Regions:
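Conserved anion-binding
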Residues: 1-49
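Structural motif corresponding to alpha-helix initiation and N-cap regions
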Residues: 23-27, 57, 80, 107
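Catalytic cores of alpha/beta
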Residues: 58-93, 113
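Glycine-rich phosphate-binding active-site loops on the catalytic face of alpha/beta enzymes
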Residues: 46-48, 75-79, 90-112
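Short, basic/aromatic-enriched C-terminal tail that caps enzymatic domains
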Residues: 106-124
Length: 124
């Protein structure tokens, strides 16, 4: 199984460690990867990543609605509420969420997040 990561800002793919905006549309690139048989997309909104200011739910769900393959949300998770909000979009094609800094800084307990997901969502 191949899962591809797309890092984007304002809907455009960022490259070379987020230094450059490629002007390539994230949705268009996702559709190409879908055509190539990629299993899932990890979508990171780089304006949110590491900032712990919440996931860009609108952009992530918009991408998920435009393609058939599942999308894993990444960037900005700050607390359990962010996980609850993005998980509510499971039927839109959101298959998971990546948590980084919020775990390292103990803003989220992995057990609490997993228990919530196990009780509330089909994919778990």
């Amino acid at each position: 199984m191949i899962i591809v990561g797309i890092d984007a800002k304002n809907g455009e793919v960022a490259t070379e460690g987020w230094k450059f905006n490629s002007k390539l549309d994230a949705i268009a690139l996702s559709k190409k990867f879908e055509d190539y048989g990629v299993a899932e997309i990890v979508y990171t909104d780089i304006e949110k990543d590491g900032m712990m200011k919440g996931i860009n739910i609108e952009a992530t769900v918009n991408l998920a609605n435009e393609i058939e393959i599942p999308v894993i949300a990444s960037g900005g998770v700050s607390n359990i509420e962010d996980i609850k909000k993005i998980s509510a979009h499971e039927t839109d094609g959101i298959s998971g969420v990546i948590i980084g800094r919020a775990l390292y800084e103990e803003k989220i307990k992995i057990q609490e997040a997993q228990e919530f997901l196990n009780k509330n969502y089909v994919g778990n």
